[in-house]
């Protein structure tokens, strides 16, 4: 396990290693101690849902990874915890529509991405 601290003594990063390969969830912390992000590693590659939080603890976003590339849904929220935007990735490229939402949850804008 590798750990890094802020100058105030608060844990900044916690990263598990197995046989010199990142294995498990790497966790980043804000200086106040709240979780900033978690990144799942398997076999040294990002694999699974990477999650982010605002300093107030509200969810900021989620991105799905397969073999170190974005693959699947990505969702982002405002600091108040309201969904702001969603999109999908395939092989690290945006796949389909980018959808922006109003604070009441209704669609505000849809951007069709043609590749």
Predicted regions and their residues:
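Glycine/tyrosine- and acidic-biased, solvent-exposed loop/turn segments at the edges of beta-strands
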Residues: 1-115
């Amino acid at each position: 396990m590798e750990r890094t601290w802020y100058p105030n003594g608060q844990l900044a990063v916690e990263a598990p290693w197995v046989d010199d390969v990142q294995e498990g969830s790497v966790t980043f912390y804000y200086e106040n101690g709240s979780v900033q992000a978690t990144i799942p590693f398997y076999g040294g590659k990002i694999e699974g849902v990477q999650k982010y939080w605002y300093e107030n603890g509200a969810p900021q976003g989620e991105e799905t990874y397969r073999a170190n590339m974005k693959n699947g849904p990505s969702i982002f929220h405002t600091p108040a915890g309201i969904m702001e935007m969603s999109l999908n990735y395939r092989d690290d490229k945006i796949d389909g529509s980018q959808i922006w939402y109003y604070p009441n949850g209704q669609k505000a804008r849809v951007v069709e991405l043609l590749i």
